[in-house]
UniProtKB/Swiss-Prot annotation:
There is a cross-link at K1607 (Glycyl lysine isopeptide (Lys-Gly) (interchain with G-Cter in NEDD8)). Residues 350-388, 632-654, 1373-1405 are annotated as: Disordered. It holds the Pfam family CUL7_CUL9_N. Residues 845-1024 form the DOC domain. Core component of the 3M and Cul7-RING(FBXW8) complexes, which mediate the ubiquitination and subsequent proteasomal degradation of target proteins. Core component of the 3M complex, a complex required to regulate microtubule dynamics and genome integrity. It is unclear how the 3M complex regulates microtubules, it could act by controlling the level of a microtubule stabilizer. The Cul7-RING(FBXW8) complex alone lacks ubiquitination activity and does not promote polyubiquitination and proteasomal degradation of p53/TP53. SUPFAM superfamilies: ARM repeat, Cullin homology domain, Galactose-binding domain-like, Tudor/PWWP/MBT. GO terms for biological process: epithelial to mesenchymal transition; Golgi organization; microtubule cytoskeleton organization; mitotic cytokinesis; placenta development; positive regulation of dendrite morphogenesis; protein ubiquitination; regulation of mitotic nuclear division. This is Cullin-7. The CPH domain is essential for interaction with p53/TP53.
Amino acid sequence: MVGELRYREFRVPLGPGLHAYPDELIRQRVGHDGHPEYQIRWLILRRGDEGDGGSGQVDCKAEHILLWMSKDEIYANCHKMLGEDGQVIGPSQESTGEVGALDKSVLEEMETDVKSLIQRALRQLEECVGTIPPAPLLHTVHVLSAYASIEPLTGVFKDPRVLDLLMHMLSSPDYQIRWSAGRMIQALSSHDAGEGQCGEEGKAGEELGRLRDSQDTVAGASDLIRTRTQILLSLSQQEAIEKHLDFDSRCALLALFAQATLSEHPMSFEGIQLPQVPGRVLFSLVKRYLHVTSLLDQLNDSAAEPGAQNTSAPEEWSGERGQLELEFSMAMGTLISELVQAIRWDQASDRPRSSARSPGSIFQPQLADVSPGLPATQAQPSFRRSRHFRPRSEFASGNTYALYVRDTLQPGMRVRMLDEYEEISAGDEGEFRQSNNGVPPVQVLWESTGRTYWVHWHMLEILGFEEDIEDMVEADEYQGAVASRVLGRALPAWRWRPMTELYAVPYVLPEDEDSEECEHLTLAEWWELLFFIKKLDGPDHQEVLQILQENLDGEILDDEILAELAVPIELAQDLLLTLPQRLNDSALRDLINCHVYKKYGPEALAGNPAYPSLLEAQEDVLLEAQAQAKDSEDAAKVEAKEPPSQSPNTPLQRLVEGYGPAGKILLDLEQALSSEGTQENKVKPLLLQLQRQPQPFLALMQSLDTPETNRTLHLTVLRILKQLVDFPEALLLPWHEAVDACMACLRSPNTDREVLQELIFFLHRLTSVSRDYAVVLNQLGARDAISKALEKHLGKLELAQELRDMVFKCEKHAHLYRELITNILGGCIQMVLGQIEDHRRTHRPINIPFFDVFLRYLCQGSSVEVKEDKCWEKVEVSSNPHRASKLTDRNPKTYWESNGSAGSRYITLHMRQGILIRQLTLLVASEDSSYMPARVVVCGGDSTSSLHTELNSVNVMPSASRVILLENLTRFWPIIQIRIKRCQQGGIDTRIRGLETLGPKPTFWPVFREQLCRHTRLFYMVRAQAWSQDMAEDRRSLLHLSSRLNGALRQEQNFADRFLPDNEAAQALGKTCWEALVSPVVQNITSPDEDGISPLGWLLDQYLECQEAVFNPQSRGPAFFSRVRRLTHLLVHVEPCEAPPPVVATPRPKGRNRSHDWSSLATRGLPSSIMRNLTRCRRAVVEKQVNNFLTSSWRDDDFVPRYCEHFNILQNSSSELFGPRAAFLLALQNGCAGALLKLPFLKAAHVSEQFARHIDQQIQGSRIGGAQEMERLAQLQQCLQAVLIFSGLEIATTFEHYYQHYMADRLLGVVSSWLEGAVLEQIGPCFPNRLPQQMLQSLSTSKELQRQFHVYQLQQLDQELLKLEDTEKKIQVGHGASGKEHKSEKEEEAGAAAAVDVAEGEEEEEENEDLYYEGAMPEVSVLVLSRHCWPVASICHTLNPRTCLPSYLRGTLNRYSNFYNKSQSHPALERGSQRRLQWTWLGWAELQFGNQTLHVSTVQMWLLLYLNDLKAVSVESLLALSGLSADMLNQAIGPLTSSRGPLDLHEQKDIPGGVLKIRDGSKEPRSRWDIVRLIPPQTYLQAEGEEGRNLEKRRNLLNCLIVRILKAHGDEGLHIDQLVCLVLEAWQKGPCPPRGLVSSLGKGSACSSTDVLSCILHLLGKGTLRRHDDRPQVLSYAVPVTVMEPHTESLNPGSSGPNPPLTFHTVQIRSRGVPYASCTATQSFSTFR
């Protein structure tokens, strides 16, 4: 039958392709908080199971989870389950109408018939005791079964006599009676809730939980008999029921139980070898299980009705519930104890366990301490490694890692040895030299030996080159400076975590422990101790109670008081020392493994001197108990090794000598069985001792599994065992635990025939007495073993045929037993998960004894995995078997190559018993060409002759290296064959590089992990949605999210610390909890609503707006900020591991949102998605804040300081909320960038100009010195951090333009160049064209030229002096050599020569005129500025030194021109064939005026020097003389005529512009300042002015060119590099750019690729251009765009002419010596510098 899948739209993802759907309401109760809770059944379906139609049909046996939910959780997750009145809709009651279908009178008649039939059947049963049941009895029972199937008659069967009737029928020796009882029970159970819809009539029916699905309780035999489970419970709890049930009756009840639990917990334990459990033990487990479930039902039903707890006094009700909880805990502990013993987990306790849990958060991944191949003794914290290379632990197999090492390793790299190999030890380091195709293939120079040695690829760990290697300790603490370019400095070298004082593991400080509670056991510890006290027999139990009474003031202890007793720790320690001597062997093993014993037992008392004697006795008992198992196994081995002739003792005596003192029981038993007369009185006490301590008995049976030479021992043992079977008490011994030894002896081909015959006799006798052991033998494969023994001995084994037939008849029972142990184990797991859920919901501790033991056994093996060589027994190949080992040598260089015809290429794997392949991979190489496989088929079978099942077929790509053949097999195949059907390029032979086989984890951990994670994920996803609903309705509830999350996560942390045994289990729980709870919550609180605001974004906005109240204790601010910080610290607790594809946030409506989407949570549930959502929300908040600030304050004069302060607040808040994490610093940067990108172009240009001006002011002000200078530098640093946001944005181009102008002004003035360099080093990425860097570089080039010019001047001076000396010498020589008579003639000749020299020197007079200047020679520095990077405005006219400079300055400039023209190569200057200098008015000078030093510009210097010769000069004449514009001249005159200046401007009507005169110092006092700065401030056009509009016009021109070019190329588009080239070419050729625009830009027609790329980014952002998905580097035109065309009338299209001069130069004039001072009263100006 199938049922309709309702509420299919409310699905919760539980894993890949796995979803949970709410199905129906099961029951309700009052929760711990007084509010009603509802148990909802959630169906678990895989993808495709829910059907394709609108309403899927699902099987009622589908997996499900029962989850208690509050009304708010139901509303948030499946609101359709609420009716119109707001109440939860219960299960449908469609069958209630059937009651009215029967007439009342007819119904009464039928009820009378049923009562009479019950009475008649009881009477007939009593009459036929011991005889064959008559036919009327069978007919009566048949009619009763028919009546039982009618639901309206269910009430009649409340009669307690029905239970007596069923009991007698099930106890009847007749099969037909027992069969009829089963039919009647099935008829009664057909009325289970939902059976009519989902059950299958006459078959197994519903699950065990239908008892829990009802509102009734089961208190005794007289309760309602409504379901099969209730009947089983009532029957199984009858005293001495096992005495009344034979094998068939017990199997009938077990079959009913198996049918009842068929769909309760359909867990698959396939691949896990479950032990053989006899029916007697199974029936006991069923009784325990039914008792536990009934108590659990009573606990749930005790609060089913809201008014239930008001029917009696609160204290009485609480006491009743507390007693019920105690009974449930004791029953659950007993069930766990028996289940652990039945599955023999306790016998595996001495096996190596996985490493204990390391302390730490379960929500953060644990880092491996050492490499897998490195022994622990050699692990050193100073090992070095490189962060760039992957360790071996990250790879699934050795072959994969070997391929990675082979492809990555380069000669010269450092490597470390991971394994011991011949002469090289693990941990040795060396340098990789070379590799080849040999074996081993890798040559390494090892430091330990000083020479090279060859090893294998998989043995090496790559460290990298020497410069890449870092210390491991530092690497663990270091976190890379990812955001260094954001802040201009590296992050701290420590890894940030929440402060230990505030956030202890896991997150918050644990609750304060009560000092009084610390002195007593917790309730869970006391109940665990009470469990063992209740296990004691009568006298021992009373003695322990007497001890408790004496230490607790003699209080009378009843069950109610015992449940709530506060036991001091000292008393508990005394009890733990007393109990071991009073418990039996089974209970003692439980005591040793329990939590309270480990915490307060002898190990805890080892340091207490008050217990020395008790500890000694305790240790003796424990050592004896723990050593019995090992001694029993070793005893048989000792017997096998010692020859019989060496000892006169019998074989049995030698066996017990190896066992110890407890072996005396076996000797006494042998003696008692060998004696004549009555043996029962002697044997029975010994059997009771063996029941209490079964280890000697197990050792006796295990001795059969010894070598065949121990024939005498085997015969003796079999004789004893055969005699023991006849005693009823012996059947209570654990025969099933040692039947394996019998099977080993039966299967051994060397077993002696007499021994084999005795073994057959013994097994036949054992199975005849108890058919349970025939079932156990069937499970162990005894039928085949007996058949082989009969074949060997030609059928001459007595009773062997009968034994084989008996074993064969138990095939159905063996299947039933396997099903039962699976169902019981699955049911226990479900109850454990239910207790964990209640623990989560109620926050009450788990008080069940052995709860941690059960979880430890379920989680054991979590770190164990079947390795390759453990999966298969041998590997066979079709040909070349001597090379088969190359398939598994983990060396990718070697291979197996076939040798034969096509179709005969195969590899055969003989798998180990029970191994299910998790992954089978074939390694190939594309370099093998035609030898590489092309098609591979995998077949499976039971033998090599039956490989008929094709498991998979794979087509291999030519480029493949790893071919996965099989994955996650669900069936065991003894033989698996890999057939290479075809090779690449039609090749015949094939080459296989390797074979990888991964097996499953053969433990219960994968099953339990799946169930634990499913329940955890469903619970927390439901809770996350409910919390998200609250926060959507009221954003203020977001402030409580931190406390909610802290409570949930701390509870999971405490649970893992208390109950989970290892890191893998704890990490699985933590990861699931985090993904199910935190990830959805973060997704919901970061998703914007219809107004575009997310709850977390609103909270962060509030945090920023109220920053001023952070430290005001009088306000409510500190508490608010603390909650916000705790929330954000918690949400970023887990670091991102991987980056899945981004999820686009979709707006969601406000208020109570009834529709939600869980569909994407399967991929969003990762830590990295949390970080992505948080950073996205943080970016939106920052963008909103910055955008509001820019909109309101962009015109303000103090815009930049306020912006920097605002940015600093955002930066500090990011550190406060999220710590120095690069992701959130990047979100801050992106948020600011997003706000800047929204600015219109003119506003953006104005903002960039403001930033450039502010930086200029801070740099200029840093010259002040002192504290103000430090303050200025701090403000400058803060501004630079904010400016870094411009990097990569379109605004960077405009910012570079303005910064270039301000920087040029500073560099031409008195500013430190080192500060300029430091600023450029920090904000260099903000200059796409790198023009400021080039300007700074040109300064250094000019300094080098100045140094060379200085040397050049000295050379010229030396040459002039040398000429003068030669001239004087010639004159002197001419006078001395001539006679007096020729004196006049020779004087004329000498004079003529001198005249010639003077004539020749006239050409150089202009250059050398300052050589004979008598005053102080000024120092002149020349800056050669490249027009390529220096901005020179059009108002900066050229300077004519001949007319505007005095002679002593003019000569220096002329000499520099000659020097520059003569120079052949100058680095970093503009390349070109012609280099000419053109002097400009740019620059500055120092003049001496009286006692003042004036800092003036070059124009001002010329004007002041010009006044040295004139008393007054008109402005009009100055304009005519200099050729300057009126604006530039007036700008220079302004400071000179100010109050600090030396000139006065007199306005005259007849003289335009006025007359300049030197200010008379006698009329007004002259300033006493030593240095007066008169350089006029540089004024630039505002962004709103002509320059900003010109920049916008240029951008629009480029946009037009880009759009037109892409339109011409259509949809095919252009590569971005080609597009840039075409745009630059069009810009140069014209008709763009118009000359008017060019001249107004002031930089000529220069247009760089950076300008074009900036425009391309702008158009991409606007959607005008688009990228191709498959080729992102190709751009094409997308949609029409409105581009501002340049106005022709404002651009002067008709203007023409040559480009401006190529290079501009400026002068700096400095002087040497004492300044020249005029002696006259009139002050004059002298050039000082």
